[in-house]
Curated annotation (Swiss-Prot):
Species annotation: Danio rerio
Domain of life: Eukaryota
Stored InterPro entries: MED26, Med26_C, Med26_Mid, TFIIS/CRSP70_N_sub, TFIIS/LEDGF_dom_sf, TFIIS_N
UniProt subunit comment: Component of the Mediator complex.
Region (Disordered): 83-233, 247-320, 363-441
Protein name: Mediator of RNA polymerase II transcription subunit 26
Gene: med26
Comp. bias (Basic and acidic residues): 190-213, 398-412, 424-435
Low complexity bias spans: 259-268
Chief location of this protein within or outside the cell: nucleus
Length: 589
């Protein structure tokens, strides 16, 4: 067994011995041993770049049918990815799921509003964190939905005030610091509003809406094993914290764009908020319309709307995605402002968080007045929201949404420098452009066969068996395809298939004539041989001296030329211009 002190190179060699060339596992014990050691080994980025262990482990993970091994490999790769991607090391510290944020809107772990001694929150947070590490694509959603149901039951029960501190992690936000998000009020009036809309229905609608709106951002849901999917809630909370800090700098600390619940636990907390306050959730269409103080609030009410759109929750982490996220929301902002009825809470632009929130306090009373009347209106608009996935990360138009997008790789290995580096948005966009135009390529390729046949063919081409090559099925299908492409594109020139056929016809005709072999003519089969079947006579002697006697004093070739035994004979026995030189039988020197 390999010890834990083995170097990465040794572990790589051992792993290579345990798998075949197609990454299929040949020695499961050795592979498990290597992964166990790698889990304990404090590997560095340089060692990963040098050994390419990440690629090997990922290939093994894809090929293996052992679920436990695949999970361990995936977790190992995620840990390495956090090591490689700059700025990812502090992600779990700054914003783990369901850890309450500070009163000023940032997710600072040292400043909490809820006492740490409360048992239910302290249990939920580590459990969610560990689940999020392993199954960050599935488990948090299940956990959050079950916690939502529990909270709904507890909120509807008669002992609501007694259980308030236990059921909600973030309740002190409303009671302790009302102005933190620019809204006046206490939990009591907000809870009274719930009587107008059944809380269970709102909660179910939000669950359904949350499921639909996972589609919008990337247009294709990323594979759970893709290397970019780590700590999604933590990362969006990290991004929000930085944006909110910038907002505090701009506004001089007089107002806070977001309450702590928005920056710490994006999805579960805000859905609870929206269910508790039907005034914020129900009139999502009316709150966003320009008729409500639109001069003061250009974007769709940044502070009243929770920052939990799928655009923030689903976007993958890493500094490289920060720019993408910002540009996505700016793009979204321009689309949505021009269409006020569709400006919903989940499509709020990130840039709206930076705007001043003066004048928003008056809006709440207006929203409360319109809360009951706009309930049905809000539900109608919600039905159209799953269709609003017209914005992609690369900013493509809505017509391109039917075209499947390639899975984006967050990390790439540069063979020139030998380093693993994050894939910048510019590079990925250029790659997509390169892959996006495969159609003109065949017409470019057809230029080469068109130019070659008319030119004088050098000697090596004559030695190529073009006839046999042309009968090859692959070449035939390729030439037919190219010919069809040219024909369908309206080109008047002949395709490569035509030129190849013409060339082969001409070559076959040329080759047939020189194929006549230049050899010696066979000797006449004479029945009598002088000196063998009969005696030699004077006529035989005269004939030898004065006449051509094939097989006796010389021979003919197939061209009718006579060679006696003192001549050198040059023949072409195969008809391919290869010479066979025969020395004289008799040398007179």
């Amino acid at each position: 067994m390999t010890t834990a002190s083995a170097t990465p190179q040794q572990m790589r060699d051992r792993l290579l011995q345990a798998i075949d060339s197609h990454s299929n596992i040949c020695n499961m014990v050795a592979v498990l041993d290597v992964i166990t050691n790698l889990e304990k080994y404090p590997i560095t980025k340089e060692a990963l770049e040098e050994t390419r262990l990440g690629k090997l482990i990922n290939d093994v993970r894809k090929k293996t049918k052992d679920e436990d091994l695949a999970k361990r490999a995936k977790k190992l790769l995620r840990n390495w990815q956090k090591l490689i991607e700059p700025g990812q090391g502090d992600t779990p510290v700054r914003g783990p799921p369901n850890v309450p944020g500070s009163a000023n809107g940032g997710a600072h772990p040292c400043r909490t509003d809820t006492p740490p001694a409360v048992p239910p929150p302290s249990k939920v947070a580590p459990e969610l964190k560990t689940r999020n590490d392993i199954h960050n694509t599935y488990s948090p959603k299940a956990e959050k939905s079950s916690s939502r149901k529990r909270r709904a039951e507890q909120r509807d029960s008669p002992h609501l005030p007694a259980k308030m501190s236990k059921t909600s992690l973030y309740e002190p936000v409303y009671s302790s610091s009302p102005p933190s998000n620019g809204i006046r009020g206490t939990p009591e009036p907000l809870l009274e509003k719930d009587d107008e809309v059944p809380s269970d229905r709102i909660r179910l609608e939000h669950l359904d809406n949350d499921r639909h709106n996972k589609i919008p951002v990337n247009a294709v849901k990323p594979h759970p094993s893709s290397p970019g999917l780590t700590k999604l809630p933590s990362t969006s909370s990290l991004l929000k914290a930085s944006v909110l800090q910038q907002a505090r700098v701009d506004s001089g600390g007089q107002h806070q764009p977001k309450s702590p619940r928005y920056s710490s636990s994006p999805r579960s907390a805000t859905h609870e908020t929206m269910a508790k306050r039907s005034t914020t959730y129900a009139p999502k269409g009316t709150l966003s319309s320009p008729s409500l103080n639109s001069a003061q609030v250009p974007s769709p009410l940044p502070t009243l709307q929770p920052l939990t759109s799928p655009a923030q929750v689903c976007i993958s982490d890493g500094p490289s995605s920060v720019g993408l996220e910002g540009s996505l929301h700016l793009h979204r902002s321009s689309d949505r402002v021009s269409q006020p009825p569709h400006s919903t809470a989940t499509l709020e632009p990130l840039s709206g968080a930076l705007l001043a929130t003066h004048g928003l306090e008056g809006l709440e009373t207006k929203a409360e007045r319109e809360g009951a009347s706009s309930n049905s209106d809000g539900k109608k608009r919600k039905k159209y929201r799953p269709r609003d996935y017209t914005v992609n990360l690369q900013g493509q138009s809505s017509e391109d949404r039917t075209k499947p997008r390639l899975k984006e790789r967050r990390l790439t290995f540069d063979p020139v420098t030998g380093q693993i580096k994050p894939l910048t948005p510019k590079e990925s966009h250029q790659e997509e452009e390169c892959h996006g135009q495969p159609i003109p390529e065949p017409s470019v390729r057809t230029d080469i066969p068109q130019q070659k046949p008319p030119t004088s063919v050098p000697n090596p081409f004559q030695q190529t068996n073009w006839k046999e090559l042309s009968r090859n099925e692959i070449i035939q299908s390729y030439l037919n395809l190219q010919s069809n492409v040219l024909t369908s594109s309206g080109a008047q020139t002949h395709g490569a298939h035509f030129f190849m056929t013409e060339y082969l016809k001409r070559e076959e005709h040329d080759v047939k004539e020189p194929r006549k072999m230049h050899v010696l003519a066979p000797g006449s089969s004479t029945t009598e041989l002088p000196g063998v079947s009969r005696d030699v006579t004077n006529e035989d002697l005269l004939r030898i001296h004065n006449e051509h006697w094939p097989g006796v004093n010389g021979c003919y070739d197939t061209k009718g030329a006579w060679f006696d035994w003192t001549d050198c004979i040059s023949l072409d026995p195969h008809g391919d211009e290869s010479k066979l030189n025969i020395l004289p039988y008799v040398c007179l020197d």
